[in-house]
């Protein structure tokens, strides 16, 4: 009888409303569970990807005792207005929540859910502080469009270049080329739409604002969400291009929430996934085992029940951080991220000036240089950029790096390779590794693109972390820092978030290159960014002498 009642409840039809925004534009909104009667807590999703695609999840929430509200974003599918990426999502989110609180089926307590774009709009709405919003669950989401589009000053080219034609579709008689790579190599990159042959206002706007200026104000809520008193569940994968921002949101809320309640009621779940495989076991053909499986909806429901259900008494404690250890293929818990018990451990770069390729003399040891060592140099050629993955690999545009074997790329002369000795015992790394490098270039700008790699006894090499920094962004993203050709600079490259077991017999390796194409745009070396009409080769140097001791810093845990 209970099963039949549950099934009947889950089958109730949805209702569709045209919800008015403050400017009169009406947004198509599906409501699941309103006809069951009574006032209930409400879970809301706002999406540009078609509300009808979220019906299965909405029904799961409905079956769990919630009213589920799913809305097409402004200008998308059945909604009115013009779609401008994130430009109205703060106010539209506020207005929709306000509308929900006034409905007869709402008890005025609201949570939000969704990943990627629907996760980002949760932050934008939350930044407006709408009454009734009590909990959020953004999965693989950034509160800032700027930091979705750029990292370390480099444009996420495959992501943004691919999204441009999807948002501003080609006119009749034209179609988006199947292979955009040749177009990504033309200049100026800011005019990719002209190169393709039709206007793409969204792409051009993003590509012509490589600095965090006033253009981004409506789409950049990173600072505005500080001071919120709002429980949030953050779920993301290490290989996700939004990993850094998702984890950053958790860390900011833990530090800057307005109350102890807000600071304590944050949860981070970190798994071995990329943007399209959250909760799955296989990523780019690499099987992490059944333990990697995660039901995001189930995790969200447990979180929502804790804060929205009056008839649920949650357990006193919950793990604030659950993280999957790659190589161990097991979950661990922590009270914070990075884990407080992690100890920063340095590995210093060394060579006799020939660290080019994996067959070179680049090494890493726990000791810094005790005498002068020759610098390593490579020539970065925009006409022949280092690919982000080996030839033949087809990487989704929403990925920046994946667990794909890459040793063949380490045979290139324009890749510096530093390999530590094989481990005599297992080494557990968990947290936010970074590289501190002393560098120079004979040009007005350059990129330093890094990958941290697990080298197996067989010689296979799998990336576990990565980062990139454009030299003109070395002091931040608000205004450029000029680069004087030949001058030595100390830079810090954030290598993101990871947890992996470097097993006995495996070795840790650092790659340093001048590009990872097409994940990131190729630096023209002219200092003109996306407006460069030409490019040039550049010689990039890495130093590791006593006074210029380049190193990586690893957060290491005792096993």
Annotated model-derived regions:
Residues 11-38, 419-425, 438:
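N-terminal cap/lid segment of alpha/beta-hydrolase-fold proteins
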Residues 228, 234-236:
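Short beta-strand/loop motif that positions the catalytic acidic residue
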Residues 63, 124-227:
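Accessory cap/linker subdomain of secreted extracellular hydrolases
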Residues 70, 79, 119-122, 135, ...:
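Catalytic cores of eukaryotic secretory-pathway lumenal/extracellular enzymes that build
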Residues 183-187, 278, 285-559:
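C-terminal, loop-rich substrate-recognition/catalytic regions characterized by aromatic stacking residues
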Residues 244-266:
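Active-site-adjacent alpha-helix of alpha/beta-hydrolase-fold enzymes
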Residues 34-102, 144, 150, 279-288, ...:
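Cap/lid segment of the alpha/beta-hydrolase catalytic domain
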Residues 104-117:
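Alpha/beta-hydrolase fold nucleophile elbow
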